[in-house]
């Protein structure tokens, strides 16, 4: 998509924040309008995160207009809302390449631009990093400002409160902006969001308070009286003003779509000392009515026709693994009232919408709180229930201690349904599910299963759910299933693999859904093919049998080679003094950038041609 100067005459003048700050203030509303239209035109042609960016146009313009970026440091939490930021910071003409192989990174990324102070992708990290950056700036002595923008979904995470508690203690000069659009990826839940709703009733209190401070600030006795009166008013109007109790000077809420008002407020706050908190109200999907009405559907979009007002329907192909899980969950819950399902704010992505509607009293969206999700599940298990934690591989990393300390050590029957395992694709380095086998395999008493297709996935979910001697994990990928027939549910024998094809000299031990590629390679090389099924416990007997019957072994997995399933096979062979050559094929020792899943697998040699080439080169 080439940039149309005639269509965007004001935006054409802005290819850097320095150019933005040269614009007359009265032209900024027009700039916002053009920026929003350009975002719609670009993302509808290329795909990407959509509704969040539409809601932050005015805020982005105001921040870069008031602050001397990149000298002043602007930090975006998660980064879904940062597309306007990228457009205004020299990446306007490349925005159509976002999330594509070799294109712009899907989130703010330090290696891409000096304006991207913090690389992000996971939520709730901005305030912690911002405090560190603000402290460093203070010690540097260059009067550099620090601003963090965090959403109402991300601020529900415990890490954000840990950071604010620390900021209130050491009092760095920084500004935290809460972008309150009343909508994160899933519906926001929890007491904090109820509290934010209560804050909306405090506009009169906020204006009276700030006005009174200005009028009476020079009169000490009245100033002290105002402070005492304020404490009483605070208790009556806004019970427990949370952010001020944490040590922040709270201002707001203010209209996040009034660019002139935002500029005025930010200028007033820019030179204030200590931790400042600005609460702005925005509308996710602002300016595009279909996204305003359905911001969840329009959170991330494929290519679509903006004039149609709707996203293209799926071609009616095979169901995704998330739906396979969701269907199994509903089927099992209908038969067992003990099932409890937990998600950390990923209802739609994890395939749990139908379950949440059919079984609302057994569905728990704990918000962006992975640590709490796991220990909450532990408590349910202690209480005699059967918790299923549906979580993306990349987000389970955030609750690792809870998996060990609160679940595994106590041998509690918690099942982890690990979605987005392996290569995820367009979201890049921060979202690849590359490490779960490695970080779970070393936990004692953990049972880990890797299905090769959707039927095996269902059987493993059934097996894990009915396993009562400790935690279990079933990991499955993003994307569509393979179209195999679904058979009646039955428990699989724990730790047993299956030989799928008998060959000569070479045996391929496959873990997971690369099985179709492995089957092609086995056929081409006349190799034995094994569906290992279990990463833990491994089928030691079968591994030793394969070692005895073949000249060499190949392990195949879509997980980091280091510490993964293949490493487990190596350990078995060494423990039994079997010096059989083994080639471990999996994800390499670097963070895998964005691109389609197919592009990544081809580049990494994890398609059939690449796997065959790796094996032939190794055997040569």
From Swiss-Prot:
Belongs to the transketolase family. DXPS subfamily. Its EC number is 2.2.1.7. InterPro entries: Dxylulose-5-P_synthase (IPR005477), THDP-binding (IPR029061), Transketo_C/PFOR_II (IPR009014), Transketolase-like_Pyr-bd (IPR005475), Transketolase_BS (IPR020826), Transketolase_C (IPR033248), Transketolase_CS (IPR049557). It is an enzyme of class 2 (transferase). Binds 1 Mg(2+) ion per subunit. Homodimer. SUPFAM superfamilies: Thiamin diphosphate-binding fold (THDP-binding), TK C-terminal domain-like. Pathway: Metabolic intermediate biosynthesis; 1-deoxy-D-xylulose 5-phosphate biosynthesis; 1-deoxy-D-xylulose 5-phosphate from D-glyceraldehyde 3-phosphate and pyruvate: step 1/1. The keyword Zinc-finger does not apply. One of its GO terms (molecular function) is 1-deoxy-D-xylulose-5-phosphate synthase activity. The gene is dxs. Thiamine diphosphate binds at residues 80, 121-123, 153-154, 181, 288, 370. It comes from Salmonella typhi. GO terms for cellular component: cytosol. CDD domains: TPP_DXS, TPP_PYR_DXS_TK_like. Its cofactor is Mg(2+); thiamine diphosphate. Catalyzes the acyloin condensation reaction between C atoms 2 and 3 of pyruvate and glyceraldehyde 3-phosphate to yield 1-deoxy-D-xylulose-5-phosphate (DXP). It catalyses: D-glyceraldehyde 3-phosphate + pyruvate + H(+) = 1-deoxy-D-xylulose 5-phosphate + CO2. PROSITE patterns: TRANSKETOLASE_1 (PS00801), TRANSKETOLASE_2 (PS00802). GO terms for biological process: 1-deoxy-D-xylulose 5-phosphate biosynthetic process; isopentenyl diphosphate biosynthetic process, methylerythritol 4-phosphate pathway; terpenoid biosynthetic process; thiamine biosynthetic process. Keywords: Isoprene biosynthesis, Magnesium, Metal-binding, Thiamine biosynthesis, Thiamine pyrophosphate, Transferase. Mg(2+) binds at residues 152, 181. Gene3D superfamilies: 3.40.50.920, 3.40.50.970. NCBIfam families: dxs, PRK05444.2-2. This is 1-deoxy-D-xylulose-5-phosphate synthase.
């Amino acid at each position: 998509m080439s940039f149309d100067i005639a269509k965007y005459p004001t935006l054409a003048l802005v290819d850097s924040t320095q150019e933005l700050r040269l614009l007359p203030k009265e032209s900024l509303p027009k700039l916002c309008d053009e920026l929003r239209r350009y975002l719609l035109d670009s993302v509808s042609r290329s795909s990407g995160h959509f509704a969040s960016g539409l809601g932050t146009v005015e805020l982005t313009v105001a921040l870069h207009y008031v602050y001397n970026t990149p000298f002043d440091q602007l930090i975006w939490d998660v980064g879904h809302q940062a597309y306007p930021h990228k457009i205004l910071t020299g990446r306007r003409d490349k925005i159509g390449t976002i999330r594509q192989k070799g294109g712009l990174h899907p989130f703010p990324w330090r290696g891409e631009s000096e304006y991207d102070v913090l690389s992000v992708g996971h939520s709730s990290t901005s305030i912690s990093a911002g405090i560190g950056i603000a402290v460093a700036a203070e010690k540097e002595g260059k009067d550099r400002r620090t601003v963090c923008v965090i959403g109402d979904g991300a601020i529900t995470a415990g890490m954000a409160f840990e950071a604010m508690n620390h900021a209130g203690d050491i009092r760095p000069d920084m500004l935290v902006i809460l972008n309150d659009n009343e909508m994160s990826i899933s519906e926001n839940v929890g007491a904090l969001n109820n509290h934010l709703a209560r804050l909306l009733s405090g506009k009169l209190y906020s204006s009276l308070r700030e006005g009174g401070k200005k009028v009476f600030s020079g009169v000490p006795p009245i100033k002290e009286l105002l402070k005492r009166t304020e404490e009483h008013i605070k208790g009556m109007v806004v019970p427990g003003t949370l952010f001020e109790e944490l040590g922040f000077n709270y201002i707001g809420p203010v209209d996040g779509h009034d660019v002139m008002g935002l500029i005025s407020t930010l200028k007033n706050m820019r030179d204030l000392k200590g931790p400042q908190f600005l609460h702005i109200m925005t509308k996710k999907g602002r300016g595009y009515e279909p996204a305003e009405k359905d911001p969840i559907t329009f959170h991330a979009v494929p290519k679509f026709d903006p004039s149609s007002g709707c996203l293209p329907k799926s071609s009616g192909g095979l169901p995704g693994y998330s739906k396979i899980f969701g269907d199994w969950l509903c089927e099992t819950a209908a038969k067992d009232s003990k099932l409890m399902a937990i998600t950390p704010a990923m209802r739609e992505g994890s395939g749990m919408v139908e379950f949440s509607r059919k079984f609302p009293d057994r569905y728990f969206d704990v918000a962006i709180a992975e640590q709490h999700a796991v220990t909450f599940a532990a408590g349910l298990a202690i209480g005699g229930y059967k918790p299923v934690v549906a979580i993306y591989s990349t987000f389970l990393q955030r609750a690792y201690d809870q998996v060990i300390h609160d679940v595994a050590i106590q041998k509690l029957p918690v099942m982890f349904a690990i979605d987005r395992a392996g290569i995820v694709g367009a979201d890049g380095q921060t979202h690849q599910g590359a490490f779960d086998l490695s970080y779970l395999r070393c936990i004692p008493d953990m049972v880990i299963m890797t299905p090769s297709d959707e039927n095996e996935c269902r059987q493993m979910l059934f097996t894990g759910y009915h396993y009562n001697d400790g935690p279990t994990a079933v990991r499955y990928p993003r994307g569509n299933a393979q179209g195999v027939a679904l058979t009646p549910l039955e428990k699989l024998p724990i730790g047993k693999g299956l030989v799928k094809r008998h060959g000569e000299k070479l045996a391929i031990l496959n873990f997971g859904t690369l099985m179709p590629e492995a089957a092609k390679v086995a056929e081409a090389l006349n190799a034995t093919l094994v569906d290992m099924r279990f990463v833990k416990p491994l089928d030691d007997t079968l591994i030793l049998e394969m070692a005895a019957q073949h000249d060499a072994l190949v392990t195949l997995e879509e997980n980091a080679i280091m510490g993964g399933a293949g490493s487990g096979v190596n350990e078995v062979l060494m423990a039994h003094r079997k010096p059989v050559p083994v080639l471990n094929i999996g994800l390499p020792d670097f963070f895998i950038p964005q691109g389609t899943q197919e592009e990544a697998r081809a580049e990494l040699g994890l398609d059939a041609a690449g796997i065959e080439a790796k094996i032939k080169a190794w055997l040569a």
